[in-house]
UniProtKB/Swiss-Prot annotation:
Its cofactor is Zn(2+). Zn(2+) binds at residues 92, 94, 107, 110. This is Replication initiation control protein YabA. The gene is yabA. Homotetramer. Interacts with both DnaA and DnaN, acting as a bridge between these two proteins. Keywords: Cytoplasm, DNA replication, DNA replication inhibitor, Metal-binding, Zinc. It holds the Pfam family YabA. Residues 45-81 are annotated as: Disordered. Residues 46-62, 72-81 have a biased composition (Basic and acidic residues). It is found in: Cytoplasm, Nucleoid. Involved in control of chromosome replication initiation. Inhibits the cooperative binding of DnaA to the oriC region, thus negatively regulating initiation of chromosome replication. Inhibits the ability of DnaA-ATP to form a helix on DNA; does not disassemble preformed DnaA-DNA helices. Decreases the residence time of DnaA on the chromosome at its binding sites (oriC, replication forks and promoter-binding sites). Tethers DnaA to the replication machinery via the DNA polymerase beta sliding clamp subunit (dnaN). InterPro entries: YabA.
């Protein structure tokens, strides 16, 4: 190999290393985003599980205390109240984005669902 071929080979390797470095940086950024999203989803999942457990406990204590009430009428009102509470806590209750966190204020789909009679 003469000096020019050796120099061209080194330049080619340098370009490949630069390209790999950029790809590695992009991959690192993507992994960071995925880890952050995973953490948010885990927190949201835990929060929803706690809410579900609390709702189940409330429902079981309510049925024990109010066994003489009509279950059909109270279940409809209670479900609506639970959805309204979830909406006030910042979660979507509409069929479009159900369960995801509301980020930009009120959702028209959720509000129309809450206002149905």
């Amino acid at each position: 190999m003469d000096k020019k071929e050796l120099f061209d080979t080194v330049i080619n390797l340098e370009e490949q290393i630069g390209s790999l470095y950029r790809q590695l940086g992009d991959l690192k950024n993507h992994i960071g985003e995925v880890i952050e999203e995973n953490h948010q989803l885990q927190m949201e999942n835990q929060h929803l599980r706690e809410r579900l457990d609390q709702s189940d406990r409330d429902k079981s204590s309510e049925t024990e205390n109010d066994s003489a009430q009509k279950p059909g009428h109270s279940d409809i009102g209670e479900g609506h109240d639970n959805l309204a509470r979830l909406y006030q806590e910042g979660f979507h209750i509409c069929n479009v984005h159900y369960g995801s966190i509301r980020k930009e204020g009120d959702c028209l789909f959720c509000l129309s669902f809450l206002n149905k009679k």
